[in-house]
């Protein structure tokens, strides 16, 4: 088996290294000191095509492999961990689940968000279950307008920034939640509407 990178992978890694060294390195300490979300870095990730790397070409992405994502992440993580994490969350996790299990309508709606710089989030951790998926108690039950989610999640990386969430629940079917529409809190505590 040949473990050498292809010419395209070497070029991708070089582009990521140049962006990291030429732009992100100078900003990293400032983002850490102020604990602010690095929106300027996200804009640069979008311009470089590093958001949604694994999104299929037919949906506007690069159709990149996980190895391609890791090459980009490795170069960026050398200088700015938070920006590297944004590449991970914008190319794996929710994006992979949506590509594998989402409807065409969901893909058309949500992939552009990621490609434009919206980093998705995964909501799995619960007060009593931690991140043990087998112990989750949050439920999603069918409701007149979609689903009603009952339960509590904690420690959601990007919860204050993300619009697209993959919420782990006990359910017979799957769906995606977006902040401000799907997943919007209702008047009942810990009850969310979803469709």
Residue ranges, per PLM feature:
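Buried hydrophobic positions in well-ordered alpha/beta secondary-structure cores of metabolic enzymes
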Residues: 9, 20, 49, 56, ...
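A short, Trp-centered hydrophobic/proline-enriched beta-strand micro-motif
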Residues: 116-125
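A short core secondary-structure module
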Residues: 150-192
């Amino acid at each position: 088996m040949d473990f050498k990178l292809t010419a395209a992978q070497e070029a991708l890694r070089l582009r990521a290294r140049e962006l990291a060294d030429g732009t992100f390195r100078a900003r990293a300490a400032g983002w850490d000191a102020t604990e602010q979300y690095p929106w300027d870095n996200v804009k640069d990730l979008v311009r470089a095509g590093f958001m949604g790397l694994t999104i299929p070409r037919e949906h506007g992405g690069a159709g990149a492999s996980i190895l391609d994502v890791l090459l980009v992440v490795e170069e960026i993580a050398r200088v700015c961990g938070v920006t590297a994490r944004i590449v991970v969350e914008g190319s794996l996790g929710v994006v992979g689940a949506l590509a594998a299990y989402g409807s065409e309508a969901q893909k058309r709606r949500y992939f552009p968000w990621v490609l434009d710089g919206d980093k998705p989030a995964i909501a799995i951790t619960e007060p009593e279950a931690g991140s043990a998926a087998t112990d989750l108690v949050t439920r999603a039950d069918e409701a007149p307008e979609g689903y009603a989610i009952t339960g509590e999640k904690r420690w959601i990386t990007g919860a204050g920034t993300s619009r697209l969430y993959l919420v782990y629940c006990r359910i017979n079917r799957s769906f995606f939640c977006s902040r401000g529409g799907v997943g919007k809190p209702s008047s009942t505590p810990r009850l969310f509407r979803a469709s």
